[in-house]
UniProtKB/Swiss-Prot annotation:
HAMAP family: DNA_ligase. One of its GO terms (molecular function) is metal ion binding. This is DNA ligase. PANTHER family: DNA LIGASE 1, DNA LIGASE 1/3 FAMILY MEMBER.
Length: 601
């Protein structure tokens, strides 16, 4: 299969703003792809060489070295490449222009013919894999030579998307949900197969692996798919409410209640003597927690399992829980073994999804928890999450206050009926989080995605000083604007923000972004931030839940304030539009709705 095919489709995808058109075009590309390398094609579409959970290195080519590779490939002076880049702001477009110029001025371009062999997807994939995996002395020069070799063979359009791929900036607007829908259309006979494909992906979060199974065994093979140790399961997510009485009613009157820990959620896989740890974002974080690997090996029973818990920093003297920030301090230390001494951790387990070749995601919580409790040996490091079974408001409140007093964020209230399965990749009312109220009318913080930026005035003139934030709509796989946040940033954070945003700047709005507001710059929906505000209000300026509460208006956050970046969350993990609507419906209503506030004022 020629790489040119992918490049031509990327060129078309980049110009589309409709998700339906995006999905249809992507389905067309998949159906025309070589089935033998369909997994590689899918990874390239995702802008990666392999799934994040494998923990393999990324390409590791910086701007400076890309400029050098383009210079070598196009026989152009490095300064000229750099000046053109400063003028255009897109290295991929720089490569395309220089390759076009090279072709038109060469003798082959004059004759209107070419003798070079076409660039194959396999060659691109294997060469870029070498670039990523090459280490040691002289590795930088080798990486540049390998990349320059590919760019020499590439035509202008191929060069454009090769460079963007290496930069990690494909800009074609494709999310995992769009790829899933396209796979259902291309290989499953239509959109009706989407649920089957999505379920498989939720159990094995590897789109390339799912695509390979479909083309080799057919869509029916996905119906019996089980979790596989080494491939993370997409985590089950909780809804949120701030009223204990309403929570208990939602889960059927009785529930299992766990502490909600202020730590890092971890999915732990074991097969024989191999142990893997995956983050909430399904990244391989095993190397960050050699102590946890040791604890799981020593204090759990079973040859093969997938379990879930929270890694929490604890005081080395008292054993009391420390905050999430302490865990972040540990991660920043270069000497991991020194970090283990300074910031020890405990693991609090709360679920079991797979054990000895049996899929437990379809079994009720009580069955899963009972088995989980039976495989943990008595010890001081790996424990079952603090929990209680409740059937009345008083016990729920009492346990909630106890959790807060012991350093927790609140509690997770979990349904215990026969239908209380593990809903991989889904957010539902089987789990509901109850967190302490903030000193604000909003009952909880929200996690929103940056989709644009606005330049400041006065001392902040010339700098991006406020952000257009969006909530995630999983039904449409889009990001709907919900507020413009300008407060809460330190000067240092603002300086860091300029670089962050310029790296993901776009010329036009991302096709997955739904916004009436026009920021000064559009960006890729990559970064997630935790935001607090005074209340959720109706606003004609924003598209979150457009026309749901009031015609021609959406929902917005009044007086939003930045709290922190949520690097542990992907854009699709952000607060959903339905959650924003739920929070709006649950907040105390005034007799007259406050008039919409323009956050830019």
């Amino acid at each position: 299969m020629e790489f040119k095919v992918i490049a031509e489709y990327f060129d078309k995808l980049e110009k589309i703003s409709s998700r339906l058109q995006l999905t249809a075009l992507l389905a067309d590309l998949l159906s025309k792809s070589d089935k033998a390398i369909i997994d590689k094609v899918v990874y390239i579409i995702q802008g990666k060489l392999w799934p994040d959970f494998l923990g393999y290195p990324e390409l590791g080519i910086g701007e400076k070295f890309l400029i050098k590779a383009i210079s070598i490939a196009t026989n152009t002076d490095e300064n000229s490449v750099e000046n053109l880049y400063k003028s255009i702001g897109d290295l991929g477009e720089v490569a395309r222009r220089l390759k076009s110029k090279q072709q038109s001025t060469g003798i082959l371009g004059f004759l209107g013919t070419s003798s070079k062999e076409s660039l194959k997807v396999d060659e691109v994939y294997s060469t870029l894999s070498k670039v990523a995996l090459t280490t040691g002395e002289g590795s930088r020069d080798l990486k540049i030579r390998l990349l320059a070799g590919l760019l020499k063979k590439a035509d202008p359009l191929e060069a454009k998307f090769l460079v963007r791929f290496v930069e990690g900036r494909l800009r074609v607007g494709i999310g995992d949900a769009t790829v899933l829908d396209a796979m259902a259309i291309a290989f499953g006979g239509g959109q009706s197969a989407s649920e089957i494909v999505e379920r498989a992906y939720n159990l094995r979060a590897d789109l390339g692996n799912i695509a390979k199974i479909i083309v080799e065994k057919g869509i029916e093979a996905l119906k019996t798919l089980k979790p596989e140790v080494g491939i993370p399961i997409r985590p089950m997510l909780a809804e949120r409410l701030s009223n204990p009485e309403e929570i208990l009613k939602k889960v059927g009157g009785s529930a299992l209640v766990d502490y909600k820990y202020d730590g890092e959620r971890a999915q732990i896989h074991k097969k024989d003597d191999k142990i893997f740890i995956f983050s909430r974002r399904l990244e391989n974080i095993t190397s960050q927690y050699p102590d946890v690997v040791e604890y799981i090996s020593k204090y759990t029973e079973g040859k093969e399992f997938i379990i879930e818990g929270e890694i929490v920093a604890v005081d080395p003297e008292s054993g009391e829980m420390r905050s999430f920030q302490e865990l972040m301090h540990r991660k920043r230390k270069s000497d991991i073994y020194e970090a283990i001494k300074e910031y020890p951790v405990n693991v609090f387990l709360f679920d079991l999804m797979y054990y000895e070749d049996v899929d437990y995601t379809t079994k009720p919580l009580e069955v899963r928890r009972k088995l989980l409790e039976s495989i943990v040996k008595p010890n001081d490091y790996v424990k079952i999450a603090h929990h209680i079974q409740v059937n009345n408001i008083e016990d729920l409140k009492s346990f909630f206050y106890r959790a807060i007093s012991e350093g927790g964020e609140g509690v997770m209230v979990k349904a215990i009926g026969k239908d209380a399965i593990y809903q991989a990749g889904a957010r539902g009312w089987l789990w509901i989080k109850l967190k302490r109220d903030y000193q604000s009318e909003m009952a909880d913080t929200v996690d929103l995605v940056v989709v644009g930026g606005f330049y400041g005035k006065g001392k902040r003139g010339g700098k991006i000083s406020s952000l257009l934030m969006a909530a995630y709509n999983p039904k449409t796989d889009t990001f709907e604007s919900v507020c413009k946040v300008a407060s809460g940033f330190s000067d240092e954070q603002l300086d860091e923000l300029q670089k962050k945003l310029m790296e993901i700047k776009r010329d036009i709005k991302h096709p997955r972004v739904n916004s009436k507001m026009e920021p000064d710059i559009w960006v890729e929906p990559v970064y997630v931030a935790e935001i607090i505000g005074a209340e959720i209000t109706i606003s004609p300026l924003h598209t979150c839940c457009q026309d749901v509460v009031e015609k021609d208006a959406g929902l917005s956050i009044r007086f939003p304030r930045f709290i922190r970046w949520r690097d542990d969350k992907s854009p699709e993990d952000a607060t959903t539009t339905d959650e924003i609507l739920e929070m709006y419906n649950k907040q105390p209503k005034k007799k007259i709705e406050s008039p919409p506030i323009d956050e830019s004022v």
